Amino acid sequence: MKQDHSAQLYDEAKSLFPGGVSSPVRAIKPFPFFTKSASGSHITDVDGNEYIDCCLAYGPLILGHGHPAVKEAITKQLENGCLYGTPSEIEVKYGKLIQKYYPGMQKLRFVNTGTEATMGAIRAARGFTGRDKIVKIEGGFHGAHDAVLVKAGSGATTIGVPDSLGVPVDVVKNTLQVPYNDIHALEETLEAHKDEIACLIMEPVMGNMGPILPKDMYLRAVRNVTRDYDVLLIFDEVITGFRVSIFGAQGYYGVEPDLTTLGKIAGGGLPIGIFGGRKDIMETVAPQGGVYQAGTYNGNPLSLTAGMATVEVLEKESVHHKVNAKGKALWQSLTDIVRGLRMEGQVTPTGIASMFQLFFGPQPENYEQALKCDKLKFNEFWKHMLQNGVFFPPSQFETNFLSLAHSQADMEQIVTACKKSLAAVK
């Protein structure tokens, strides 16, 4: 596979950007491919190599690249302007549509990224409760702000240790950690810090270490325990919102949090974040209350237009039914390949079909178990997949995604590429 132009661009990029990229996950070794264009389920690099895209920009593109309805909506909005600095009608329309599927978001705030959404939700929880401590799940990723940049799986301690230079220990000393799928660890932590904890923030389905599904009744138990200890529950649905179902993971599992964060799919491929929840909590947010949050690009009409167009397609075209049918067939095919090769490996998860990953090891249930998989073998597998024309996210702990745009031919090529790649790394 020829990648000369990508290699040249990477050399130039290294003189411009830290590590040659604008986000660390893109720093593929020895160099990343540089994208020229993308359409539907395919992405093409500057050297003319075309790949079936199962990364899909790390989750936002459930309709695929450049869906006609989304492009048409953006084009129409551009004719009316791309940024106002005032409220707009699209905010009201899209806000009502969000509430239709996430009724627990009784009031909400449009922001620009998932990071901003989780930061706003945590700040609102702290402001509402008057408490400083928060709990997060080991291995859970909630953006790049200081309070949640805590090293996961840090041995026996639950006290936060910064996972980035530049984050003061004093900032994260109020960030506690518990393992996923362990209700007893959560109870013990809440008991040990009774009346000190503002909130638990968690991905209901762990999207940044797998994905990994909740055990039966785990989320319901989390909801009950947080209520018992008067701790607010935040579901970070930046990945799972509009992905697990149109109602998100909270609708899929029937568990309503106090606060929700959305992003990715909710922006239709443009930058967005949303946080919202119970009316009494959200009324502490400025200008109604004393919890400050603001932004020049909040409520950006282009992002809201793209997001609303995406959700309308999800409604009209039974997207989840179609994508899940593809995903279930793919899961079975990949599982059969792994078993046929007698490899120690798992295709996870088994129940949510548009999200999947291959683990070379036992089925993980939490971050500590996920870390024990054979990451070196995954890296080799990933390289073979790219050579075979399929682009998976380059990290073992990221999630592969399917979209409406993936055709039957795409699915067959993914299976063929996996069979060749798995055989090569056996």
From Swiss-Prot:
Cellular localization per UniProt: Cytoplasm
Pfam families (alphabetical): Aminotran_3
Pathway assignment: Porphyrin-containing compound metabolism; protoporphyrin-IX biosynthesis; 5-aminolevulinate from L-glutamyl-tRNA(Glu): step 2/2
Catalytic activity line of the entry: (S)-4-amino-5-oxopentanoate = 5-aminolevulinate
GO MF term (any one): transaminase activity
GO biological process entries: protoporphyrinogen IX biosynthetic process
Keyword Oxidoreductase: no
GO cellular component annotations of the record: cytoplasm
Known cofactor(s): pyridoxal 5'-phosphate
PROSITE patterns attached to this UniProt entry: AA_TRANSFER_CLASS_3
Highest taxon above the source species: Archaea
SUPFAM superfamilies, sorted: PLP-dependent transferases
Chief location: cytoplasm
Keyword annotations from UniProtKB, A to Z: Cytoplasm, Isomerase, Porphyrin biosynthesis, Pyridoxal phosphate
Enzyme class: isomerase
Modified residues (N6-(pyridoxal phosphate)lysine): 264
Family: Belongs to the class-III pyridoxal-phosphate-dependent aminotransferase family. HemL subfamily.
Protein name as annotated: Glutamate-1-semialdehyde 2,1-aminomutase
Organism: Methanocella arvoryzae (strain DSM 22066 / NBRC 105507 / MRE50)
Species lineage: Archaea, Methanobacteriati, Methanobacteriota, Stenosarchaea group, Methanomicrobia
